[in-house]
Amino acid sequence: VLDRTETVWGFRWMEWTADKGFFLNGKHLYLRGANVHQDHAGWGDAVTEAGMWRDVRMMKEAGFNFIRGSHYPHSPAFVEACDREGMLFWSENAFWGIGGFRADGYWNASAYPVEAEGRAGFDRSVKTQLAEMIRIHRNHPSIIAWSMCNEAFFSAPAAMDGVRALLKECVALSRQLDPTRPAAIGGAQRPLGKDRIDLLGDIAGYNGDGGIIPDFQQPGIPSMVSEYGSVTADRPGKYAPGWGDLQKNEAYKGLPWRSGQAVWCGFDHGSIAGSVMGKMGIVDYFRIPKRAWYWYRKAYRGVEPPTWPVEGKAERLVLTSDKHEGVRTDGTDDVMLQVGVQDAAGRDVSGNPTVTLTVVSGPGEFPTGRSITFSVDSDIRMANGKAAIEFRAYEAGTAVV
């Protein structure tokens, strides 16, 4: 025996329909979801498996049953967490555009190459990543769709024929590699008319105003609102969902033919478009919920929100950890440390003193090294009386912070 691997897999059956929505194991299920980027504050994309599980559980705790992996193949650990937590997952390929049609080198460059000499290599890369995503993740029962792209229409007009041709090739490849799951076109709300891309796959996801555009109402194929909301807010934000365009005709209430809807987005994240564009999460970059997260938890699970921090004098700090022992030191595990500010009566207050955490003894590090400082005017934020960071160690021992 030269090599051996074990894979854990499960049984389920699903059906996406054009007129009655989505069915799981024979029962109708409206997909209530969130888009999730997998980078974390301080650590970027170097996220531990524990951090990925924490993210999935936070979305589940809020009452969501669906995650859209935006907009690239997520780690196998993230998908395994979806399997074990009972979270349905839309796995997306790394072919996306963001708000523009400029030349290469700009953050809002054309999603598809403008120059002809770059197209063959780009096509190969997109199809290779799609094939690798399917082969790596295909045994995960949580995955209910393979998505070819997100908003690939953000391409120069001269490149749109190439976009359509590549999407057709990706759909064919997806069907060949896994005929049991539908091939989705994500962020397919443009263009309109005869040049539509939403009908190129088996299911369509519409972002933003795509959820209310007449062309995409009962489009003739299974569909969902793959993004709504896009509310920019620093924590704590408003105790409200931010339905965005879905508010205009009460589409947020759900339609019988629509399979579901996913908020943009679950967590704040890094963005090539700048920090403001990365603050649309219902949970902040450090994994502290904004008030919108509590709104969803109340709406979907009936759990009342906590008492909000009050104005008052900061008299003491409370340091908590999500676990205290049994933490692995192989780079796959971490602990979440949270600092809270209280007054003399033990009430949470909204004051924002500057706080420094330091490793006094033992192994372990923050993304900034052996100490980290939170302040109100820093990217490492103390806000509304709270701050948090993930802490990890690569050697055994007892860490004292």
Each predicted region: which residue ranges?
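Acidic/polar low-complexity surface segments
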Residues: 173, 182, 368-380
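Residue-level signal for well-ordered, solvent-exposed loop/turn and beta-edge residues enriched
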Residues: 27, 345-347, 386
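Active-site mouth of glycoside hydrolases
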Residues: 1-203, 207-221, 231-235
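Short, hydrophobic beta-strand segments
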Residues: 376-395
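Short, aromatic- and glycine-rich surface loops/edge beta-strands on solvent-exposed regions
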Residues: 1-2, 307, 397-401
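Short aromatic-acidic-glycine turn motif
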Residues: 15-17, 357-376
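Substrate-binding clefts and catalytic carboxylate motifs of secreted carbohydrate-active enzymes
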Residues: 127, 140-147, 154-187, 196-198, ...
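Exposed beta-strand face motif in extracellular beta-rich ectodomains
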Residues: 335, 387, 395-401
